[in-house]
Amino acid sequence: MAIACAAAPGLRGAEPFNGAALATSAKSSSAMKMSFESEIGAQPPIGFWDPLGLVADADQERFDRLRYVEIKHGRIAMLAVVGHITQQNTRLPGMLSFKENLAFADSPNGVAAFSKIPPLGTLQIILAIGCHELFVVKQVEGSFPGDCTTGGNIFQSAWDNMSEETQASKRAIELNNGRAAQMGILAMMVHEQLSNQPYIINDLAGAAYQFN
């Protein structure tokens, strides 16, 4: 009885059920999802895949933000994979730290390399990334997510000369490669922590690497 009385004031001020409004909202959400299913990146063999429902009720602005983040992470992961493979037998000449008498050649492969970087070196890396994020690699207003071109270079000219179909294909390829790279660099890092061998591909192929 007490619970019923406590709920009564809230019920008195409640609006009547509006089935038409609910149906309109559901239809709008469904139409928005359908529009995302035709976006670049929703392609065979997986198609539109959103198991966490991140864009279930999202508008175009929210979708574009998530797509920009996905592209950025994919680009970083692609650089990470290339860097991870390149450093297996390659080191910069000279010293990493004169104070600690540490040469670049003294750095091990993989994640273990971070343990050799002095604090000031780590700070330099963070500052360099921050400068690129804030001042260099910036989203072009009014363009598609991930367009950070600044103009005035040969790459921009080559891009502008491509047809819309070719540009769409290139963007889809970048998305797929970025997604694969994110899984790839994570797999290599996990493999290294499990076996202390940073290069699973080299191990499977029997290829040697100099630094470890």
Curated annotation (Swiss-Prot):
GO cellular component: chloroplast thylakoid membrane; light-harvesting complex; photosystem II
Record key words, sorted: Chlorophyll, Chloroplast, Chromophore, Light-harvesting polypeptide, Membrane, Photosynthesis, Photosystem II, Plastid, Thylakoid, Transit peptide, Transmembrane, Transmembrane helix
Pfam families: Chloroa_b-bind
Targeting presequence: 1-34
A Gene Ontology BP annotation from the UniProt entry: photosynthesis, light harvesting
Family stated for the protein in its record: Belongs to the fucoxanthin chlorophyll protein family.
Induction behaviour: Levels are increased twofold when transferred from high intensity to low intensity blue or white light.
Membrane topology label: Multi-pass membrane protein
PANTHER family linked: CHLOROPHYLL A/B BINDING PROTEIN (PTHR21649)
Gene3D superfamilies hit by this protein: Chlorophyll a/b binding protein domain
Principal localisation: plastid
Gene: FCPE
Protein name as catalogued: Fucoxanthin-chlorophyll a-c binding protein E, chloroplastic
Subunit field text: The LHC complex of chromophytic algae is composed of fucoxanthin, chlorophyll A and C bound non-covalently by fucoxanthin chlorophyll proteins (FCPs). The ratio of pigments in this LHC is; fucoxanthin: chlorophyll C: chlorophyll A; (0.6-1): (0.1-0.3): (1).
GO molecular function terms attached to this record: chlorophyll binding
Free-text function comment from the UniProt entry: The light-harvesting complex (LHC) functions as a light receptor, it captures and delivers excitation energy to photosystems with which it is closely associated. Energy is transferred from the carotenoid and chlorophyll C (or B) to chlorophyll A and the photosynthetic reaction centers where it is used to synthesize ATP and reducing power.
Locations listed in the record: Plastid, Chloroplast thylakoid membrane
Transmembrane segments: 76-96, 117-137, 178-198
